């Protein structure tokens, strides 16, 4: 009993504290939820129990307060009859509504425990208000659950304010579960039915707790861990299961106790070799009181016990059960005496325990409890009986209470189960005295377990009653505090209501005055309206006249709107026509500007053509003069040749005197004549090129004049078309643009054809120029070679002159020689520009007058001819540079068509008219190897400017 008191004392401070600190099934929230809490007239326990004086005084004081104070009468429409509401005065009704608002606000924002307290106060006030109320003899929470199911449901369905998360899950679960039958509008059970149902639930929870959970390390009064309750409790216990489940559970509990205790006694007897059978009976009552007193594994509540109080223990069983009681004392309660021994005994336990996987024995390190094990443990001790050391026997005896309940096996099966033979020592073999001990122990265990169970139930009921008394004292204290706070708040609210009532009365008086003024104004308005009724007839006649005039005005307005729409459409048409004419005018002006620009360009071309014609006439006169001079020179040279030949024939006798007198003069004459011949040949080739350019320019001018005339005709036709088709100017404009495109395409094709023809002609002229240049080079070479010959070969000069006179036409042999000497014709064009350089270079080469005429003539002629060759080679670069004076940079020739910059080897040139010539010239190596020359020839078509007449005169 001392241990029970100590254990109860360990839990009482936690119970008096916050409910969440030691949340056992007997905590305030659980007590309010439990069905055994609902007892009539504050009598907590039915049957043989009595109500404590403290509880009776508290309830009587609360009821007196409720009856005396009218503010606590909470008149809800769900609780009072209509007659009772009518019987009360206006002040009581106002106070009741104020109290109802305050309680509802507190229910909305308070914690669940405070909500339950407030609801208890509310329903106590409701129950004490009416003397004829049918349920006023119930407790406050029973009144709550039976009379106001809707209020409980509303309080359970409040919006989450943050405090609901602090409550345990089972609280919320049981709150929702308690409201479900009330939602379905089912009749609530009576007190006896609710009590029986709660006791049945507690019996089921006790059995499941013994089968599936492990108790705490300390024994609190009637309390167990919430986790062990929820883990070891199957869903069958939450449903309304029948009495058959309870009977099976009791049978299972009984047989499990018998089997586990018999096995432990057998092990102890085997260890001691059957030596100790009768021990002194001192301490038996103490052992059983301590062992059977607190059962922390059982949940709060009383198992339904249809029998009376248990009978007294027979003395014979007390003597026989001394080993068991000592074993229980050592096995059950060494958690208080030796807290370290549990860890030492449980840790070296090596054998696998065939227990449920959801029950962890060492999860929270609690001490073992009586009658707590897992349900599906089948034959748990064959493995432990094979361990024969004293430590293993202590371990098995210590862990026996943890796994003392097996499946419900009958007693003969438990006794007749074949035990595995021990393997270690022969001293522990089973003997006949051991079987007798086992039988006596089993009988003793049956009696003790039954009476122990009854004692457990009784003691648990006392613990529950004590806990409930504590909870009721706390609840009453809280209810009194809440009542005082409600009284204060209602006094404040009444003062506010009085102030508001005064304010509203003043407002009502003001509105009465305002209403009176409005009625007066309404009467005056009615009088004025009645006086003006006779004037309404005249107004109606005037309105009819005005309506007829309005109709006429509307008709006129419609006509004017139609005319305005027609005028707008006409103005839009005129605007479109004006825009079209403006566009045509702008196109015509652009065309005129374009034609003026073309006219300026063509005038510039005409001026250039006139200048070129003047230059051509000058060139022709100069050419005639040069031809005359060439004739004179030729005749004079022929005469000198004849004279020299005659002298050579006849004057062999006097060879020494003639060279002395005639050698310097002859050398001067030969050098001048050669220079003159070379300059004339260069001028001839240049003027031939200028003539070709002039002819091409004239051809282009004629083509441009023809295209301008054609454009003039087309523009005149287009203007006449625009004038004649002025109405449909858009279509005419589109057609005109198409015609312009077609005309431009035609002009482009014509210009391309003319350009191709001109390319062919230019190529032909270029070939002729090459031939003439080559012929002039050959003539110059022949004259040089004839002058280099000695005096005896002078007749060959005449022969060379004859061949030169005969080679005036273009032959195929000259073309073949042209291919061989492709490099020599480049320098002949620039000899005119290189004449000064030739003179300056040949002057120092003149030797002093030699002794013999032949040697002096030969040396001088060789030097001059060699310099002529080098001058032609050196002046090739100068020719390319000086050609830029006559061949300016490429630019597009201004004309309406597109001029192709196609070179001579392009396939565009190979039309039938010029195909043969182009192929000849492309096959010739001279034409293929000089891209500069081809570029110059093709750039003839792109020269915007040509050399002026002044430059021509300078060149002449």
Curated annotation (Swiss-Prot):
Inhibits the Wnt/beta-catenin signaling pathway, probably by recruiting CTNNB1 to recycling endosomes and hence preventing its translocation to the nucleus. Residues 382-398, 802-815 have a biased composition (Polar residues). InterPro entries: Angiomotin, Angiomotin-like, Angiomotin_C. Residues 282-294 have a biased composition (Gly residues). The modification Phosphothreonine is found at residue 902. Keywords: Cell junction, Coiled coil, Phosphoprotein, Tight junction, Ubl conjugation, Wnt signaling pathway. GO terms for cellular component: bicellular tight junction; cytoplasmic vesicle; cytosol; plasma membrane. GO terms for biological process: actin cytoskeleton organization; angiogenesis; establishment of cell polarity involved in ameboidal cell migration; hippo signaling; regulation of cell migration; Wnt signaling pathway. It comes from Homo sapiens (Human). It comes from the Eukaryota. Pfam families: Angiomotin_C (PF12240). This is Angiomotin-like protein 1. The keyword tRNA-binding does not apply. It is found in: Cell junction, Tight junction.
